[in-house]
């Protein structure tokens, strides 16, 4: 009985150590430790009576991670179908531009939010239609949309960086990015709820299984009764919609859209978050929980860069090194090497015991 319990315990530990999610969490904890060493008040929390929420470096990081959670969730679904969505950063800019411009023109704030979300959904649907029904390559399709999106944002704002901070009645949109729910940043809470809802949709229905099946083999999935074109269309539409939410998070925080910088390079951050979370770029099985942790890690890396005072010129290199280290920590070969070393030590100890 004791041996069976020990064997079950060993199997649990092996599964835990072989999980990408485990190593992602370990990486996050290490980054927190590094930040705490260099910034002693990193984990310090205080109550801000003006905002009605908690304040501190960790809270600021959670606020920033909300936008990454959104685009990483959409990107996870797209990548699991063996696709890619390079347009998410530009969709953020277009959605933000639509919200700020309509608000500046005197439109009701709730209608401005709906228009921004509709624009993101529409771009996602266009991507989905081109990839699924016309059979265009996802990389080329979304690359073109990435370039076109910036142009659309400039057209909407007439090339200006629209500011809606002084517009009356913009409080709901401000709260969307800067408000608090039970002391926790509202945008982070909203993002987590959306991730959970998408996760439930994928795991409590057949949707998740169908997405994975399409990513593994479209022809085989079609033979089992799945309609790959509809699945592909759906995941790109979801990605566009979630990118629009991320765009609102980004622009509402300052009530201003920068048509060049809003969402810039965030498609790369989304892909990195998905990879860190353990979803293969080849498609198939995916982990929304892993991608969520990966998104928070991306925000944590950016916070670490600021805390360590890394030069702006060296920031991309530092970012790349940290991501590579995290990916190496998750590599199956590293796990196998560690397991083999432990096995050899156990055999040596057993041999010594027998010899004695």
From Swiss-Prot:
Query: Annotated Gene Ontology MF terms?
Result: transmembrane transporter activity
Q: Which GO terms describe its cellular component?
A: plasma membrane
Query: This protein's superkingdom?
Result: Bacteria
Specify the protein's topology with respect to the membrane: Multi-pass membrane protein
Regions that span the bilayer:
25-45, 77-97, 113-133, 180-200, 231-251, 268-290, 308-328
Oligomeric state and interaction partners are given as: The complex is composed of an ATP-binding protein (FruK), two transmembrane proteins (FruF and FruG) and a solute-binding protein (FruE).
What protein does this entry describe? Fructose import permease protein FruF
Please tell me the species this chain comes from. Answer: Bifidobacterium longum (strain NCC 2705)
Lineage, broadest ranks: Bacteria, Bacillati, Actinomycetota, Actinomycetes, Bifidobacteriales
